[in-house]
Amino acid sequence: MTATRSIAGRAVHPIGLGCMPMSIEGRPAEREAIRVIHAALGHGVELLDTADVYAIGEDDVGHNETLVGRALRAWSGDRARVVVATKGGVTRPGGGWAHDARPEHLRRACEASLARLGIERIPLYQLHAVDERVSIEESVGELARLRDEGKLAAIGVSNVTVEELERARSAAEIVSVQNRLGFYDREPLAGGLAAVCQREGITLIAHSPLGGWKAGGIAHHPLLQAIGRHHGITPHQVVLAWLLARSPAILPIPGASKVDNAIASAGAAAITLAADELAAIEAAAGDHSTLRS
């Protein structure tokens, strides 16, 4: 079993659940989505990642947070062990995506998230994206004020560079960074972000670790298939096990909209790959010539 990860001062299961797929186009019915969340929690997952804008469009904003809140209230297990991580700083004008990290928007977004989630304090609130109109120091400074007011417990940032992370840290304590990281997306590894996070004790939350639309490439990759057959696991589980072995700072949050996928992802924490297998994956990772949709 891979060691737990530390986030916001709490030890959590090394794999979280990305809840976005349960609120966008093609989403499951609410009852099924709640079953997915409960299945993940029942198999040890303790970090649920959401955001106010995980929705089909502008009129649907808040769908995912509302869903997560309902799932938690219906959960018969220990809700105190669950770390809910949400985000603010993005809007959905006309169904598109835009950045708004102005302090006044972040305050409104945080307060709306609290109401939708039905909790008194958000365990981890993340700046969803950097807004070119506002310095990251100003955005994070507002999150620090919200933390001091007791509305959130800890601050994270998302979709940032190493330089932006350092600027954010000058404004407040940053406990996590959430960036895209997976078999086909190695920038946090190649660009030094993962090393900085490991050195500074910051959790690197790997979103889209299974590639999103690139998941088909993972499923059909010859190396990942071969390693998976050897261990009796799927290529997707191979990738998650590789990420966990890559750095103790990395906490993948694979998305799921089906119960079986949520359970399989959580189970990857129990997989140990051999050193030669890890080396082979490392050598192959990032090679888009094998990508197929």
What feature does the model see in each segment?
Residues 28-40, 101-117, 161-166:
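Short, acidic/polar
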Residues 1-81, 211:
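N-terminal binding-site loop/beta-alpha segment at the start of enzyme catalytic domains
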Residues 7-25, 85-97, 121, 126:
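N-terminal small/glycine-rich loop or linker at the start of catalytic domains
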